[in-house]
Amino acid sequence: MSATLSIQTDLVYATTPAGELRGDLYRPAGDGRFPLLIAVPGGAWRVCNRAKWRDWGEYLAGRGYALFAIDYRTATPQRTAFPEAPCDLLAAIRHARGNASTLSVDPDRIGLFGASAGAHLAALAALAPEHRAFEASKSLNGFGSIAAHVKVLVGAYGIYDLFRHWQDDLALNPPPDGNVVRNLLGCDPFDNQQRYVDASPLRQISYAANKVSALIAWGGDDEFVNPAQSEIFVRALQQARFNVRTHKAVGASHFWVNHALSDPLGHSARFAPVLAEFLDSFL
C-alpha cells in the first residue's frame, strides 16, 4: 500500500435480512475531511463486484478524494432487488454521513458514481432519496434519521428508463431467456406500470431535485445499453434545469469505466480527467 493511500476493506455499512453489506474505503492517508464518492458497481442487477473499483479508488485518493465501493442486494431467480438495492445505497450514504469523523470524510460533500445498473441505482438515490418506496432503507443501520441527499451524480452508461430497457432487452434476449428488468422488478410493465415508474430515474427528475450536479457518460457503440438511455436522460435533466456535464466515449462499447486506468489510450483513462475536473468544480 502506498504511504499516501489508506485502504479499509470489508467495512459493514448495513445489515439486511439477506445478511451484512460491506464496502471498501479508499482515501488519502492521514486525517482529514475528504470529499467522498460512493461507487456503485454494475452487473445487470444480478452480480456486484466492488473490487473492480480499486483503480478508481487509488486514482481519486491521489487527487484528495475518498471512494467507498459497496456491495448491494442483487436479484436472483427467487428474489427481486427492487426496492432493496436502492435502499442499500441510501443506507450507505447515511452510514458514510453518520460515521464521517471515523471515516475521515466530509459529510457535506458526498456524491455517487455508478456504472450500468449501478448508474441506475445511483441516479435513483440522487434524485429521489425520500421516495416512499425506499422507506425501509432507514432501518438498515443506526443512521435512519440522517439525510441521504448527495451533491453530485456520476453515471456511466446507465439505465434510466426501465420500460425502454425492458423492450430493448426483450429484443436482445427473447424468451425463454430471462429479461434483466423483469428479474429486478419481478414483473413486466404491463403487469405493474407504477413499479416501472417508481424504478425509473427518468421519471424521478424534478425541479426540487435539481441542486444535484450530474456528469453523465456513455459509449457511442454500446451494445448492451442503448446510448439513447443517457441522451434522453441528459435532455430531461437539462429541461429540469440541472447542472449537467456529458462525456460521450466515441467508439466505446460497454464496461469501459472499469478498464485499467493504466492504459493511456483506454476510454477509462480518457474519462479520468473529465471526472476529476467535474469533482473539483462541484463536489
Predicted feature locations:
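Short beta-strand element of the alpha/beta-hydrolase
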Residues: 33-43
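Catalytic active-site module of serine/aspartate enzymes centered on a nucleophile-bearing elbow/loop
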Residues: 262-283
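Primarily recognizes the serine-hydrolase "nucleophile elbow" in alpha/beta-hydrolase
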Residues: 94-169
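Mobile cap/lid helix-loop segments that gate and shape the active-site cleft of serine hydrolases
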Residues: 16, 127, 135, 139, ...
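N-terminal cap/lid segment of alpha/beta-hydrolase-fold proteins
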Residues: 1-32
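Catalytic nucleophile-loop/oxyanion-hole region of alpha/beta-hydrolase
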Residues: 49-56, 68-107, 263-268
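Conserved alpha/beta-hydrolase "acid-adjacent" motif
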Residues: 223-232
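Short beta-strand/loop motif that positions the catalytic acidic residue
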Residues: 216-218, 222
